[in-house]
Amino acid sequence: MKFGFIAHPTSLGLKRYVKMLDLLQRNSTEQHSGYTRELWERQNLVPFMNFARITSATGATCEGVIKYMPLVADEMLADARGIAARVVQGIEELAGDGAELVGLGGFTSIVGRRGEATAEKSPVPVTSGNSLTTYAGYKALMQIQSWLEIRPEEEPVAIVGYPGSICLALSRLLLAHGFSLHLLHRAGNHDRSELLSHLPEEYHSRVTLTSDPEDLYPRCKLFAAATSAGGVIDPARLQPGSIFIDVALPRDIASETRPARDDILIIDGGCVTATDAVKLGGESLNVTIKQQLNGCMAETIVLALENRRENFSLGRYLAPEKVLEIGEIAERHGFFAYPLASYGERIDRQSVTNLKRYYHHDIYAGESADAALPASRLAFIDAVIAQTPAREDTLDRYHQYINPMMVDFLKLQRCDNVFRSAAGTQLYDDAGEAFLDMVAGYGCLNLGHNPQPVVNALKNYLDAQGPNFIQYISIPEQTAKLAEVLCRLAPGNMGRVFFSNSGTEAVEAAMKIAKASTGKPGIAYLRNSYHGKTLGALSITGRDKHRRYFTPLLDAMVEVPFGDLAALREALNREDVGALMIEPIQGEGGVHIPPAGYLQAVQQLCRETGVLLMVDEVQTGLGRTGKLFACEWDGIEPDVLMLSKSLSGGLIPIGATLCRADLWQKAYGTADRFLVHSSTYGGGNLASVVALSALREILAQDLVGHAERMGAYFKQALSEIAARYPFVSEVRGRGLMLGIQFDQAFTGAVNASAREFATRLPGDWHTTWKFLPDPVQAHLRAAMDRMEQALGEMFCMKFVTKLCQDHKILTFITANSSTVIRIQPPLIISKAEIDRFVGAFATVCEELSTFLD
């Protein structure tokens, strides 16, 4: 059976989209078949899409064609009678092309008395599609009720657009389900008895009527709307936690773009999505129009699949049983109201449950009107602490209160894990499944998760009620011990230590030492380096992706190409440069080892020019590379040295900046200056106790030697696998600080795709390209180049995904390069665990080796 469907654009932007398609389609036809006057004549309907064959989940088939009437709602309402005639003309055109049923989208049914008047003049049956649209809105509301865990009697629903056909049918379904309703009707219609007459009398006690939207805002947080006017509800007036289901077009929320509020949710109701079992004509590369299909169009398709040549969904009264019937038939054929969407973007359970706190004041009492009462706040905190949240609840909280983009990114990569416990090299999720951790907090966990000797040292100090934050009213004993140990262990002539809480703070302290001791504002740094994300550290981080949003940064910072001694000599001879910041291995830059002899030459240049040599060992230090300090591989003796990450065994934040005593004296050795740099939490006894224990265990367990031996074995094993696959270009690093460089080339792929389409599609698109303006061509070429780069990054992330999903191994990319996977396991890793990773890596390489070039 063949159907036709008449759609229309619902916004000016969509109208111009249809205009663009029409222009391109006619131009393509002209280039392919030649010019004719008829081709460029005014058309009643604009061709949009032909479905040569639709196959449903049951195996039923149909075919159809969709055309647009190129008018928005306001234009149609301005000439309702004339548009009604054009709709009938359009139906006749479709019937002439073989359509046996025609669906009327949006206003194309409204202008014909919801299809009734149109049906009287139509040569074939018609449907407004409003029954399936209603069903989709109903199912969306039922899903939201379930996710919010509320009962119908607990939360009233506002129905906006009563007694329109969709709102009337939806009201009857919701009342039958137990909801109370606030019905918003058009102003001027105040006959209460007439308005209530559309509903069974048994429901009247659960219904209120109003023509003023202001009455709804304080009463309701759940809304469903389907008016013919649109723009009825002001999103700024909605209560926090409100969920607004815009069931039909035009939008009834007064905003064509998503409102800038994160405490409400606007849902595109009335839409359905086809499952994978449904085939909508020819499909290639899983590219087909299947998601968020308007219910009116989907109803037309479903009726055609059923071979039902009958008028359907006409007039004001849509029988609830017919609504449920068409919904059940649609689901049988593979069309469902899920997933939900907001302004075209898919949303999931988490988007709804983020608002749950606005509905459960018994649990979230601290956010209720009684939040000012101490007892209420205490009850809230106690309730949160007592919870053992499910994984989804934790994702919801993080999404709501910390970083929604991070949650969405990890979900996209199938790496949205939530772990409950950790020990050694293993992390355990709430199902008790173990994951091998090859990231180790980006170098924080050299001793593994919760190293018992360090945990014991922490417990013992707390059990003894040892003092912690006393460093500004007395001298902290444990911190003094730690400073001595660090100065004795570190290379160079270290004599002073400043303690902080992180690597980037340690870098900030080093920069201040350099400025204060030399009197020079400038610091040289290396391209592709990474030293942290505070403003000072960013100023000497050699990667624009981290810096561009925070400019202007510090002046007088000088970037030098990595490995270029001539450029470095020029920079160090500048009058305003007093220090050079380097990493022994560029970790976040992609695990790059300097060229042989480079670091010794760098040190010599610093000595010749009198420039301070500052070495960032935040990630490379404390055994990671097979030496206690990575700079020892090259015999480097820094003037300033930075440590953090594994200094406390990953248990307590700590950073340390070591320097020569004479530098400290120049910077801070006067009555006015000895306290000009400080940190509230830096230098506390508790962190120092833990750090002393961590340092002892690194040495006692010979993790430095273990890292050297296991790292050499690991690198060799990975390199042998990499040699078999051209998309793994290099395995590099030292000790247990390794990086796997991927190079799955997509250069030219997007360009080839564009040329292929230009060649195969009707018309002369190559000539069209020639006459695009130069700036347009330049932007398109740049977009194609970046897209090809993104495809390579996507391929690399598939390794992260597959290692996690298929092998329960955690890895991640480096901060500066999305085509390098970091391998930084705890230094306690066993040979068997390394072999497990090597085997998994080999398997993933083989599985992703469809293309070898």
Swiss-Prot record:
Top EC class, one word: transferase
Residue numbers of N6-(pyridoxal phosphate)lysine PTMs: K645
Domain of life: Bacteria
Pathway the protein takes part in: Antibiotic biosynthesis; prodigiosin biosynthesis
Cofactor: pyridoxal 5'-phosphate
Assigned keywords, A-Z: Aminotransferase, Antibiotic biosynthesis, Pyridoxal phosphate, Transferase
Protein's name in the database: Aminotransferase PigE
